[in-house]
Design a protein with these regions (language model features):
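Nucleic acid-binding interface residues in structured DNA/RNA-binding domains
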Residues: 2-110
Length: 110
């Protein structure tokens, strides 16, 4: 039986996974935020695809959400993503993270 490699397929994927690991517990970042942290600010969709298929225990994929605080998809189920966020003190209501602007990381200047 072949062992599946846990190494990222390319440099951008590696940068995305590194950026996602930097998101602190109890905070969230959007796919666009992570794309910018990984050096490709217009690659939000690519980040979404990477997060959707990640499934690695060392990457907190559940902290990466869609624009406007929508929780988006998850390699597990949406209910599992909600539970992981709730375990970190975040509240999801109506498919969105409550107080999104306050818990978004990194904080945006107003």
């Amino acid at each position: 039986m072949k062992r599946r490699s846990t190494a990222p397929a390319d440099k951008f994927t590696a940068r995305v996974l590194t950026a996602a690991r930097r998101i602190p517990p109890g905070r969230v970042a959007t796919y666009g935020d992570v794309a910018a942290m990984a050096g490709r600010p217009r690659a939000a969709r690519a980040v979404g695809n990477i997060m959707r298929t990640c499934g690695r225990a060392d990457v907190p994929c559940h902290r990466v959400i869609a624009a406007g605080g929508r929780i988006g998809g998850y390699v597990g189920r949406e209910t599992f993503k909600r539970a992981l966020l709730a375990a970190e003190g975040l509240i999801v209501s109506g498919g969105r993270v409550r107080d999104f602007d306050r818990v978004r990381w990194p904080q945006r200047k107003r």
